[in-house]
Amino acid sequence: MPCASIWWPYLPPPTASQRPAVSPSGHILTSVNILELLAEIIVPTVSGIPAEAHPGRASAKLAADPQHASRLLSHNAKVPINRLPGELLLEIFYVHKLSSALRIGLTHVCHHWRELALTSPLLWTAICLEDRVEFVDACLRRSAVAPLTIVSRCYIEDELALMKFIAPHIGRIRALDLRSLSTSAAEALMRQSRGSKASMESVTLHVHPGCRSLTTPTFVLARNSTRQLRSLSLGGIAIAAPSSPLTALTRLDLTDTFLASTATIDDILDLLENCPRLETLSINERCRRFPVKSKSADRRVSISNLRHMRLAAHTALISGLLSCIILPSDTTLEIKCLISTHGVSPASIRTVLPDGLGGLGNLAAIRSLHVFVSSNIFRIRAYDMVGSAAIKKLDMDFDNDPPADMSSMLPQALVELARSFTSRGVRDLQIVGDYGLLIEGVWREVFAHLPYIQHIEIGSRGTVNKLFAALLAPSSADATDPSFCRDLRRIYIRGAQLDVDSAARMSTLAANRLLQNRRLDTLALSCYQRVRWILHFQMMVKRSRLWVSRFQFREDWIFMRTLR
């Protein structure tokens, strides 16, 4: 802290609210008095002179004016930071224990905070290997025998230096987070952990992507070191089958873990069988030649506590894994299918999702399907209900390498998606893409597999004639079927290309559904030919004389609501 006599001339004059009060004895307590008093104690200490060499002068000042000393002590006692209980302060400190700068700053606020921080071993258990050696040594010393959390985000290549630091403290490490290891450093760490008595709660070990190969280090799940393991994240490191169930494991993250040529889908299933309390699972595999056939065709693994599952791999691996697992109803499933350009086909969805959705119990309550197709993007979302309170149950993307146009996948992919959810009671269907590619036959087959559809929303470009033609003239098998779109009530179309023929089809559709007691409540369109189209539509309404529509305008939308 600089001396007050240096900085005081440069400070602005105090305002009325900042002027010191005059005490009954006539002594004025100002910032200068406090700074000068502290300077006599702090400056000698900072300059290397022992603090005990000059406390006499400060003590003499306080002794000469007991009232001043009493007021100073009373003032310090009323300062908010000195009135907080030590237990509460420590809880606040622990929130920032991963920040080295904040921990150093805590010791420089006041004597009370410094004493509290230095005597709290748990505050110094988080060690970042990028910090200065002096600070790391101080953390190890101040943490005493408390469990350690070791973190590093930089590339670690020297295994000898890493082992020199890790080995003496391996027994009290509770969380290890090393995100960028060389292969040699990872292998040395694996050897050290096998023979140790470490009992970690969280392990994150990732080999740098540039160092990964088919010959990967192997992480052995020994019984003595995994009984408290709650979180495991491996990248570019193989994992051996556990010798006993991992009863405490709730989070598992595997990236390029099964690169070896001998890896099979049974290796994944064996691991999942030994994780009875698993809640979060993430598997990211870029290997194209992964054997996906299970030794037992009827093998099924139930993951009863799983809440979130994320898969990023090629379609064959995803399909093989989804056909062998049983998921609970409240699981959120995220899928990213990696497909090559020559592998782009409408059958991709049928390849990924098992027939009848298999054991994917989380998709049993799907009520809303969203499909988005644009250039090299093909995305599917599925929700458990319609509206803002809906919970996403399926999030599936197709990723081409290299990028390719997937618009041609829309017709058949939409049919395959409808087949997969044919018995799921889907009420809402939203499609964004070039629906001009969808012919009448495609629309009819989609509606035939979604008999409970109530709401259709379509975006992007295309003509609407084929959609209304399919609703007007179903196939011969569905012509007399009263369940064909019997619940359809609302149709929203954005960017539609409208003409006289479109107006005629829409008017006829509304009239027919009204006669069949399947009234279409709302038909909303957003188009550029609004005025011309309204004239066409009103003309068709007058000709039909079977139903009356109430027009509403909102921004660029036209709402037609049927009135009885």
Where are these regions (language model features)?
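Leucine-rich repeat
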Residues: 1-564
